UniProtKB/Swiss-Prot annotation:
Species the sequence originates in: Staphylococcus aureus (strain USA300)
Active-site residue list: H362 (proton acceptor)
Protein's UniProt name: Bifunctional protein GlmU
GO cellular component: cytoplasm; membrane
Alphabetical GO biological process terms: cell morphogenesis; cell wall organization; lipid A biosynthetic process; peptidoglycan biosynthetic process; regulation of cell shape; UDP-N-acetylglucosamine biosynthetic process
Binding site for Mg(2+): D102, N227
EC number(s) from the headed UniProt entry: 2.7.7.23, 2.3.1.157
Biological role stated in the UniProt entry: Catalyzes the last two sequential reactions in the de novo biosynthetic pathway for UDP-N-acetylglucosamine (UDP-GlcNAc). The C-terminal domain catalyzes the transfer of acetyl group from acetyl coenzyme A to glucosamine-1-phosphate (GlcN-1-P) to produce N-acetylglucosamine-1-phosphate (GlcNAc-1-P), which is converted into UDP-GlcNAc by the transfer of uridine 5-monophosphate (from uridine 5-triphosphate), a reaction catalyzed by the N-terminal domain.
């Protein structure tokens, strides 16, 4: 059976009090609507139509060709929004799910189960519901004496008795597609809001003797919509908790989950330890037996087995097996560290390749460079890679020793097994097996201060 989805993403989001389009506010580093799209796609849907309005081009820019789009010029209610997908879906057979673009916590598993329940019951419509302690603001599920759905009533149209009901509509539905578009034309706006409500489609189906099901989820967090910054922070916290829980169940030690942020696209191997205050974002891959020290930040990087990152920042970089970074080091984009490398305190590496066993232990800047195997870079060494207009490369061979407080003025190549004396400013290439000294000779005048 063909399956389709409509994502409702046309609302203004005035309560966000933001210049940014509502569904583009981020949870766990991704726009809310992107989380929804990924869950919808993961549930086995063949075609997605996103209903856009305010900020349409921004939404299209984020989702790209993963969705079709329909424009809702006036926001006249959820049924009106769904009807905007008519040109794409009206003639389609199969099941269509309708999901709100501001529900970033909905999972593909719940959508899969909703669809399965709907199709197994041969229903014309199914609503995803939940029971919550504070149902204010949600449509209520009104059941008849036999426990079947009688109608869904919106908060502003509900009687006090209906407001006391704690089973609510999530705003997520599954429909027989043909039935959906047939009934949408019959929906009226004679309600307190003067809007065309999508739940009225269910009442129309019931009035015709059709089958309408309710599937109740036990995970209330999943259906939480985000309408303001407070709810945005709650969704962020819930996503953080879910992600950390997943990693811990898969063998990762997270010492303080409440202070640890791990993005949804991060992968972490078993027996890795994440200390408090850590942030790991983007498409980061972390191996096994790694230690990520407290207050480290890692973005879009690869950390191989056995590495240790101590209170450092790693951006768009790779760290080899058993390599130690920090404390207080910064790996900038293009930093590539081999195995058993040491990058110590207050060292900055940018667009540089440090081969296996290389050491840069303290207070250095290494940029646009290649450092050979087992080479030691002394404290305070700087690659002078920029002349104000262009960047130049520094190459240091294997098994070399560069003393403290050395300036390597690029472009320059230092060979293998070279010793560069402390305090030197190297401007010329140095061949293999050489000693390079480039500093003024010391002059001492005894008794000068008497």
């Amino acid at each position: 059976m063909r399956r389709h989805a409509i994502i409702l993403a046309a609302g203004k989001g005035t309560r966000m009090k933001s210049k940014k389009y509502k569904v583009l506010h981020e949870v766990a580093g991704k726009p809310m609507v992107e989380h929804v799209l990924e869950s919808v796609k993961g549930s086995g849907v063949d075609q997605v139509v996103t209903i856009v309005g305010h900020g349409a081009e921004s939404v299209k820019g984020h989702l790209g060709e993963r969705s079709l789009y329909s424009f809702q010029e006036e926001q006249l209610g959820t049924a009106h929004a769904v009807q905007m997908a008519k040109s794409h879906l009206e003639d389609k057979e199969g099941t269509t799910i309708v999901v709100c673009g501001d529900t970033p916590l909905i999972t593909k598993e719940t959508l899969e189960t909703l669809i399965a329940h709907h199709e197994d019951a041969n229903a014309q419509a199914t609503v995803l519901s939940a029971s919550i302690q504070q149902p204010y603001g949600y449509g209520r599920i009104v059941r008849n004496a036999s426990g079947r759905l009688e109608r869904i009533v919106e908060e502003k149209d509900a009687t006090q008795a209906e407001k006391d009901i704690n089973e609510i509509s999530s705003g997520i539905f599954a429909f027989n597609n043909k039935t959906l578009f047939e009934k949408l034309t019959q929906v009226k706006n004679d309600n307190a809001q003067g809007e065309y409500y999508l739940p009225d489609v269910l009442s129309l189906i019931l009035n015709d003797g059709g089958i309408v099901e309710v599937y109740r989820t036990n995970d209330v967090e999943e259906i939480m919509g985000v309408n303001d910054r407070v709810m945005l922070s709650q969704a962020e916290k819930a996503m953080q908790r879910r992600t950390n829980h997943y990693h811990m169940l898969n063998g990762v030690t997270i010492i303080d989950p409440d202070s640890t942020y791990i993005g949804p696209d991060v992968t972490i191997g078993s027996d890795t330890v994440i200390e408090p205050g850590v942030r790991i974002n983007g498409r980061t891959e972390i191996g096994e037996d790694v230690v990520i020290g407290q207050y480290s930040e890692i973005n879009n990087s690869t950390i191989e087995n056995g590495a240790c990152i101590q209170q450092s920042v790693v951006n768009d970089a790779s760290v080899g097996a058993n390599t130690k970074v920090g404390p207080f080091a910064q790996l900038r984009p293009g930093a590539q560290l081999g195995a058993d490398v040491k990058v110590g305190n207050f060292v900055e590496i940018k667009k540089a390749d440090l081969k296996d066993g290389a050491k840069v232990s303290h207070l250095s800047y290494i940029g646009d460079a290649v450092i050979g195997e087992r080479t030691n870079i002394g404290c305070g060494t700087i690659t002078v890679n920029y002349d104000g207009e262009n960047k130049f490369k520094t190459i240091v061979g294997k098994d070399s020793f560069v003393g403290c407080n050395v300036n390597l003025v690029a472009p320059v190549t230092i060979g293998d097994d070279v010793l560069v004396a402390a305090g030197s400013t190297i401007t010329d290439d140095v061949p293999n097996d050489s000693l390079a000294v480039a500093r003024a000779r010391q002059t001492t005048k005894e008794g000068y201060r008497k």
